[in-house]
Amino acid sequence: MCTAAVYKTKDFYFGRNLDYEFPYGEEVTITPRNYPFSFRFQGEMKKHYAMIGMAHVADDYPLYYDAINEKGLGMAGLNFVGNAVYGEPVLGKEERTAGEKKTGMAEGHEIEAEIDNVAQFELPLWLLGQCASVKEARVLLSRINITNTPFNEKYPVSQLHWMIADRKETIVVEAVADGLHVYDNPVGVLANNPPFPQQMFRLNDYRSLSPRQPENSFVPGLELTAYSRGMGAMGLPGDLSSASRFVRAAFVRGNSISGDSEAESVSQFFHILHSVEQQRGCC
């Protein structure tokens, strides 16, 4: 059960809560620039951007939960159980122009045009290795086929959706039964289920909430007092379900303010993430 968020002052911050009851061996992992990777369908990527994030390293391969590259493009995968649907590899080149290639975003790396088969676990490396921005990631996503190829027998395919962001824009990527969808994300947060459009629609239920104190409109002539700070946000969900965490994170992140210094910004960003953290045993 996870929640991801972005935050921007004079700098850009990308982070997430990874709330599990037990660890999966994840650790801070740095992938140096141009460290060679072999993809199941795309061959070897010899040139790519450096990145840092949380990963479980298996067979010298970083299985990233989340990461950000040297250009400031961040990406996080969150559980999307019951909704994520990946495709079989699209083999053959019958529909491609013979010899047609397109150059990837990282200098010197070429990828074939039209359809790129990329295993689900390879997606962070595929995008963060080549793309300097969300705009560039959209280009690769427009021709990608995320496949249901497992890393190995020990690590089966994970059901995920992803938030991808730079300092200018944020998107959500969901592979579901009717295909791959890329959504603009104006609230800069993501949780788990339900699918992103439903999460966004549910925000309509909370349109009256505010960080300001509420006006008394209960009954004409009846004097009522706002006896505590924060009463403008009464009704903001506080349970640990993913739908409620999405609403709470969107509200807190969207109304948070801090100074522009690094210390102030980092502190406030951790406060945002702490607002939706989960305590062991509570769910």
Annotated model-derived regions:
Residues 170-179, 184-186:
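Aromatic/basic-lined ligand-recognition segments
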Residues 1-115, 148:
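A contiguous strand-loop segment
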Residues 60, 119-120, 156:
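Short, glycine/acidic-rich beta->alpha junctions
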Residues 80, 176-178, 252-254:
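Histidine- and/or cysteine-centered catalytic micro-motif in compact active-site loops
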Residues 1-13, 27, 49, 149-151, ...:
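C-terminus-biased signal that marks the final domain/tail of proteins
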Residues 18, 79, 166-168, 177:
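Short, flexible loop/turn elements at secondary-structure junctions
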Residues 134, 138-174:
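Aromatic- and glycine-enriched pocket-lining scaffold segments that form the walls
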Residues 77, 93-102, 106-147, 240-279:
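Alpha/propeptide regions of enzymes that mature by internal proteolysis
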